[in-house]
Structure formats: C-alpha cells, structure tokens
Amino acid sequence: MKSFSLLASAGLATLASLPLTMAGVITPSYFDKHPLSRRQLSDAQVQRELGPQLSRGATIIGPGGPGWDDAIERFDNESRPTIRLVVVPAVESDIATVVKLANRFGIPFLVKNRGHALTNTIGRFRGIQIDMSRLTTITIQPGEPAESAWFQGGAWDKQAIEYLWDRGYVTVTGSCDCVGMMGPGLGGGHGRYQGLYGLISDNLINMNVVLADGSAVRVNATSNPDLWWGMQGAGHNLGIVTSFQSKIYPRKIDTWHYHSYTYTQDKLEAVFGALNTFHGNGDGSTPVLMGLNTGGFYIDPSVSQTEPVVSWVFGYAGPASEAEALLEPFSRLGPAAEQSGDVPYPGVATAMGTGQDQPLCQPGDAHVQVTSQFNVYNATAERALYQLFNRTIAAHPQLADSVAFHEGYSTAAVDRADPSASAVAFRDRKLLMFFDARLKPADAADPEVLGMAREFGRQVRRIWNEGAPDLKPATYVNYAAGDEPLESMYGYDAARLRRLRNIKRKYDPHGRFVYYNPIA
C-alpha cells in the first residue's frame, strides 16, 4: 500500500510546533470538571487539546491537510470509515493518550495498520483514526526455550519477512506481503509456515495492550490470562496491541519451489479431485512443507476471452525435486499453461501472486467479499460456482475482475495446538474460501452495480456452504463481510461465546471496540 510522507504531513501539527504543558499554561479542557461534549467539540479543538499531550514527533493530520489522502487510504472502499482526524503516534504511549482523550470527549477511535480490513462493519465508524505506520520496530531476542522477537504493532508482513530473513530467521506471517502482522493475528492468522509452526496467534508470547479505558497492560498466559485467551481469535474486540513478542525460528530452508498451473474449464472436476487426494480428503495429512496452495476462477485473455480458467499455484518449502514429486498428479492433467521456479522465502509471495506490487495488494477499489471454510472440495458445487461465475460476468462485465479463491494450507502444527487454549474458532476446518468481486470506484458508486456484486457474493457463499451439508457454515473472521451470524465467526459452542461476552464486558464495558465484527 502506498505510504505517505510523515515529513510532509508534520507541518500540520507536531509537538515541535505546539507548546508543552507546563506551569502557567492553560490546562486542557479535559481536566475540567465538566469537559466539552462530543457535539460541542470541533476537529480543530481536538487537535489543540490533543497535540500537547503527545510525544514530540507525533503527528495529527486534519481533513485536506498534507498527507490526508494517503493517511485515510484503504485497500477496500466498499464500506469506508468516516475519519475526522488522523493521529500518527511516534511512540507506543501516544496510543493510550489518544484513547483517554477520545473517551473524555466521547469520540470513537479506530486503529489502522495497513488498512486491509474487509468487513463492512467498519463503515459504521466516525471518529479519530490511530495510524500505526511509524511503530514498526523489530527487535530480536535470542533466548531459551525459544528465540523470539518483539514487533511493534505497525509491523507488516514484507517488512518482517525481509528483516528476519536477512538475520537468519523466519516466523509465521500472513500470506500477502502487504498486510499487517497483528491484524490477522488477532483473528488467528493463516500463513505459509503454519504447517510447521502454527497460526500467527499460536506463536505469541506477550502482548502490550491498550484497553478501552486507555490503560496499558501486559497480556500473556499468566498476566490477564482471560484477556490472553480472547485476544487470540477475537482480539479486534478487546484492545489495541501496541507491541507483541512472538516466536521466531532459525532459517533452515534456503529456497521455496513454486509451480502454477492454468487449466481450461473441462479439467475442473479432475483438478478438485486431485486436490482432495492431495489434502488427504480433509484428514490433515497435507504435506507439511507444502505451505500453501491457492487457486480459483478468473478470466485469462491469453486462454479465453469468454470462459474463466481454473488456475492454481503451489508453494513448497524445499527443492524442486521434492515438490515436483508431490505435484505430479497436477502436471498429468494437461494444463494449458504452467510456470515454475525457485526463490528465497522473501520472494515466494510475489511468485504466488500476493506480492507487494501485484494487483491483489493494490488499494483503492471496492471489494465485495464472502468467505467459507470446510474440509473437502465438492466438485459438483465448484462446477455450479463456475457456471454462476461464467453467467454473471458475461451479463455484467463490471464484475469481470471477480475472483473465487480457494486456500489450502498445511495444517500439521495448527492441528497440534489445543483448541481450548484460545478463542480461535474452527481450527479443525482445513480449507479456506474467499470470493472477491472487485469493483472500480465508479462502478462501486453505482447502487445497481454494487447490489449485483453483493448478490453475486451471496450466491457464491450459498453454493459453498450447501456443498458441505454436514457442516455448519464457518466464517474466517479476518475475511468476514460483516453480515454473517456471530456463531459462524466465533464458533457455535455456547460456553465459548458466553466466555467471550464476559471478557468483552469486563475489558470493554462501554463498547469502544465495536467496529470490527463485534461480538456484542
């Protein structure tokens, strides 16, 4: 995602240009017995009140000011939050300061790291955005029983992968270069190394968290253990992670092998049959080093102008000889095109289509998305989905950039983790679906086109869920559209939901964190 110039924006409001609080200076109004109400307070007043309380170098950006457009830029523009002001903290303690002042004035606050929230629920927000883009420091902590690193809350995948790789380490991150680490981690966090090391959340050791009232606490298995449980799986509802300690691992694998296949539609059933065999028909036996395979349907003009192709790419943590032995069934199917190669781990995202500069990571469009999770591909359902896909984009060319993604990660270490140890739901689901109807801004602004895209998504989700009739619908919370039942995001176990709600009431009794797939 395009970054903005902090130096350019700093001219609007920085501590260097604001007086420090000291004896003889008028006390800010939030120390008054009767502070200003939300309706009385202008954005300019908020800036004047907040500025002196922040660290030197922190930045406040107002509407129309230098850097404003970049500061509020998001990956998904279907349902945007309404931002009154942007605060860019220079140190972690600035976050608690912002939260306390926002609470004092009754102004909602929302954290942005890389701006990849997909859920429509953030469209309900209007208030102050806390921008984590300057809090990206990574500090390696060698030690026993496991080596680890501290990551500030703004750390993101490509940055972390490259930093650790250059120093001889790897860790679990998401599979797209451009997303933050902790955002996905609060919902579990799938990634290419999860077969070896588990989800992002499985690797957490400590979190520094700012609570809804602005207090800062250390959270781990023994300090605030109930919050620790909830932050792993439902953390978006419970606090702001300003920094976190996570396990890292010695870099033992020099190169990853990738192999992409493009098939014509007549191979669809054979492809999904081979995938089910490859994944052990849902028994968790996916080869542990085949970190991720992902694919789906889209228009490839080099193959057909009118029929979507079936495209798949595999990423293997090891040499080509080992990977190709596993991929031989897919090569036998007679792809229309294929490509393979070997890259160091920092290059595998680009090789698999999820790199920083590739279309999947570019901001500015609207994304109407749905998701599902199950264990075995239903080829009949996938054929129905393909036919729906073909009919819909033929009738509505504005939807031609839509993609139906299917993600199959290795799950060995994920399966070994105790499901009762965290709030992560549906740990036993092996396959992760994601449909994205991508619209240009002009098309998204047309209510008729947007309505068609949403109906397209609802039909896709229904086909996927009906294709797994023995399972209750499951929603990966990080991919949720926001209209799904609560149980489908956080689990159907009544005791777990009750526990989550109790934690929510304890740590956020006034509902400050309610803009990301809220549990209450």
Swiss-Prot record:
Per UniProt, residues of the FAD-binding PCMH-type domain are: 79-251
For this UniProt record, the keywords arranged alphabetically read as follows:
FAD, Flavoprotein, Glycoprotein, Oxidoreductase, Signal
GO molecular-function term, one example from the UniProt record? FAD binding
The source's domain of life comes to: Eukaryota
Top EC class, one word:
oxidoreductase
Describe which pathway this protein belongs to, using the record's wording: Polyketide biosynthesis
Q: What is its EC number?
A: 1.-.-.-
Glycosylated position list: N77, N220, N378, N390
Q: Where is the signal peptide?
A: 1-23
**Cofactor(s) for this protein?**
FAD
Expression triggers: Expression is increased in rice-extract medium (REM) and is correlated with the production of pyriculol.
| SUPFAM superfamilies registered for this protein in UniProt | FAD-binding/transporter-associated domain-like
Query: What family is this protein classified in?
Result: Belongs to the oxygen-dependent FAD-linked oxidoreductase family.
Q: What does this protein do?
A: FAD-linked oxidoreductase; part of the gene cluster that mediates the biosynthesis of pyriculol and pyriculariol, two heptaketides that induce lesion formation upon application on rice leaves but are dispensable for pathogenicity. The highly reducing polyketide synthase synthesizes the heptaketide backbone of pyriculol and pyriculariol. Pyriculol and pyriculariol contain several hydroxyl moieties and double bonds, so it can be assumed that several reduction steps occur during biosynthesis.
**Which protein are we looking at?**
FAD-linked oxidoreductase OXR2
